[in-house]
Each structure stands twice: as C-alpha cells, then as structure tokens.
Amino acid sequence: MKHRPVVLKFGTGILAREGGCSLDTTQFGRLCADIAAMSAEGIPCVVVSSAAVAAGVDALGLQKRPADLAGKQACAAVGQPALMGAYTRHLAPHGLRPAQLLLTHDDI
C-alpha cells in the first residue's frame, strides 16, 4: 500500500531548550527515532522545521535571543547549518539522511 507523505512541523518550542537559546538534543533523538519508525513502515515524511535562530544563538555563544530582526537573521544564518547537522547526527543511526529544500512562492 502506497502512503501519502506526512508533513511534520517541528517548532522552536519543541526543538529548543527552554528559553530558545540552544537545541534539545534529547528531543531531536526522540523525534528522529519517530521519523525512522514511520519511514520503516513505508510512510514518507516531510519535516518543516524551525529552531535555526535557537541553534545560532548557541553557536554564537549569546546569552539570549536577539530581539531585533538583523540579530535574528544573523542567528538563523549561522544556526541553519547547525540545525541540519543535528538532523544528520540523529537520523544517521537509523540509516536515514536529511535533505534541505528551499521553497519559493511558486512552490506553494
């Protein structure tokens, strides 16, 4: 039986530790195990993920999330590779590899 893809939205509140200043690696492990279980059942998963700013706050060694747009953009730019790295590390033990897709307005 062919399954339709399941879209999973993981927000910062789920992926980051309290305060939104770093990623919650334990939670990443659980969520990636769930993704692997669905994949093993033949259910394709598409993950829509937030938390790049939180990952960037941590990577830049900041004490708190910036309030201004430029600060948030800088954190997101630095944090996006770290976020993908977290998915890579937690999916690899399950034989899975993440891929990033950047959508344009025309894709939606």
PLM feature spans:
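Nucleotide/pyrophosphate-binding catalytic subdomain
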Residues: 1-108
